[in-house]
A protein has these predicted regions:
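Short proline/glycine-enriched turn/loop segments at secondary-structure junctions
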Residues: 77-78, 130-132
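Short proline/glycine- and acidic-rich turn/helix-capping motifs at secondary-structure junctions
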Residues: 120-126
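Hydrophobic pocket-lining residues within nucleotide cofactor-binding pockets
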Residues: 4, 77, 142
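Short, structured "edge-of-domain" segments at secondary-structure transitions
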Residues: 29-49, 108-114, 126, 133-139
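HKD (HxKxxxxD) catalytic microenvironment of the phospholipase D
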Residues: 48-120
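Single conserved hydrophobic/aromatic residue that forms the stacking wall/gate
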Residues: 137-140, 144-147
Length: 147
């Protein structure tokens, strides 16, 4: 997505991290969440992809064991969008569409040309893909499913 600034959503993401949920977020622009902070957000990573185009997909992939729920939507998680606008989010149930979205997320996560990773102080450093842990993705993440 483009931005994550809504304090209520951020608090819920922190709570999920504290409960042990692994979370990967791909946020193009403003992100008010701080990843990798001890006892707060140790299970969260934030990747920013800055390319030639102002592209930012709003794909939400939730996974628990082998159960995946995938959604696409129109809103960035900003207070003005969630509280004062009409936005839409819809589930993706078609397996072929899910597969295509998974491939897209893999492409984003593996990108090491346009990607930056947010450090726990809010600064960014150039991202180098590693086979470790888009959008919210609970454990295991798309990286865990690579072969």
């Amino acid at each position: 997505m483009s931005s994550l600034v809504d304090p209520e959503i951020i608090e819920l993401i922190y709570l999920a991290s504290q409960a042990g949920v692994k979370i990967s977020l791909i946020i193009r622009g403003v992100c008010c969440l701080y990843p990798q902070k001890k006892n707060l957000s140790e299970n969260i990573e934030v990747i920013s992809i800055i390319g030639h185009f102002l592209e930012h997909s709003r794909i939400f992939w939730f996974r628990n064991d082998n159960n995946s729920e995938v959604f696409i939507g129109s809103a960035d998680w900003m207070k003005r969008n969630l509280d004062r606008r009409i936005e839409a989010v819809t589930p993706i149930e078609d397996l072929e569409l899910k597969s295509q979205l998974f491939t897209l997320l893999q492409t984003y996560i593996k990108d090491d040309y346009f990607s930056w990773i947010m450090k726990n102080d809010g600064s960014y450093e150039k991202y180098r893909f590693k086979s470790a842990t888009c959008l919210l993705y609970t454990s295991p993440s798309p990286r865990d499913e690579q072969s």
